[in-house]
Amino acid sequence: MKPGETYQLGQHRLACGDASDVALIKRLVDKDKVHVVLVDPPYSVAVVQSKQWLNPKSQHKTISNDGLVSDETYEAFTTTWLEAIKPHLAPRNSIYIFNSDKMLLPTVQALKASGGKFAQLLIWAKTQAVVGRLDYLPQHELIIYGWYGRHIFHKSKDKSILVYPKPNRSKQHPTMKPVGLLRRLILNSSSVSEVVYDGFVGSGSTLLACEQTNRRCLAIELDPEYCQTVISRWERLTGQKAEILP
């Protein structure tokens, strides 16, 4: 898959490009309205490089835009991609942004600055810690939850701490999320056939969660190799073939 191309994967669409590209998003979304934004953007923690000392032979690719940057730069980056998808949101919508402790404040500030509401902080509690250089090894990731305007929540009184095992280490992506966790968020905030947007789809876990819950995923990924991984995972799951769009 090449930059600028868009593929149809059953009821889903995948574009290779930048989540801040307004024209690309307009083509991808077309006349649809997005009910859920569920994204795992780069955290500005250089996740692959920071672990290179642990495993010098690691085959993981560097994540695009994951270099260490200032809070101000990261807030501007977040504001830009939020503003790009904002015109395509349904009147009732939900926003889920995975993030790290380090970039929590700039992300919340960007959500508020773009007119969004920061409602709650959810925690993905992993069953094992992530090895690294910090004094306290992280065993969690944060999920910023909010919306623009109004929202719908389908499950009464879910919990803010979401316990799911970290996926086994995979060559497909260094920060892969559990499909079960994504399914839970999608089911809480959308109905069958509604649209879920992921502008940083990585290896495609959000798209697979949409396939399993009968939602439509509109996805963007900057890295062509990860785009191909998304297509391969979906084709293996469904037995269908992705088709390039004109």
Language-model regions: role of each:
Residues 3-4, 240-246:
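Short mixed-charge
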Residues 225-236, 240:
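Short alpha-helix adjacent to the SAM-binding motif of class I
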Residues 1-227:
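Core catalytic lobe of class I
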